[in-house]
């Protein structure tokens, strides 16, 4: 028996990542789960920007309902790291469109890996510089409002739709009810 303390080992992971997954309260189809994917991308990219990091690897997974079982989990490696909500969401939706089999969905998972410091913006000839700068500024403003006034202080209109989980999820801590904090 090895009686060594775990704290005696200096272990540093080679690659850090952040992730978010959600078990849904009901079965979702391919159309209404897109709202959940976008909401989860908003949450993850806010965390990414708060860490002042960019991601190069986007992993996305779907768990189907128990009635059918199974699911998929795939990764996409970007050429250029990003912290842009729209770009990361589009990557997730690309994976979803490629692998989704039109079955009832009960779980959505997203992970962002290959993290690096956010040192600037990589530009190319095929993208509008103005749009990239605008998106980055918009994301920072929305993040600062949410930090100052709470996650539900500024929401997208789509978060008011019946299939949205964002407002209720924002009232939870680690997926558990934070009732005493809100009442």
Please give the residue ranges for each predicted region.
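DNA-contacting surface of Y-family translesion DNA polymerases
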Residues: 1-104
């Amino acid at each position: 028996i090895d009686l060594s303390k775990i704290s005696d080992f200096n272990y540093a992971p080679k690659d850090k990542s952040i992730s978010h997954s959600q078990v849904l309260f009901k079965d979702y189809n391919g159309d209404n789960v897109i709202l959940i994917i976008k909401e989860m991308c908003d949450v993850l990219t806010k965390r990414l920007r708060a860490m002042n990091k960019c991601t190069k690897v986007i992993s996305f997974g779907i768990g189907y309902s128990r009635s059918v079982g199974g699911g998929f989990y795939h990764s996409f490696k970007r050429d250029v790291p990003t912290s842009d909500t729209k770009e990361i969401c589009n990557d997730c939706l690309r994976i979803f469109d490629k692998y989704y089999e039109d079955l009832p969905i009960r779980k959505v998972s997203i992970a962002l890996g290959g993290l690096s410091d956010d040192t600037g913006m990589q530009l190319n000839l095929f993208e509008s510089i103005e749009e990239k700068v605008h998106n980055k500024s918009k994301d920072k403003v929305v993040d600062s409002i949410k930090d100052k006034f709470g996650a539900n202080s500024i929401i997208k209109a789509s978060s008011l739709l019946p299939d949205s989980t964002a407002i209720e999820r924002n009232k939870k801590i680690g997926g558990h009810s934070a009732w005493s904090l809100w009442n």
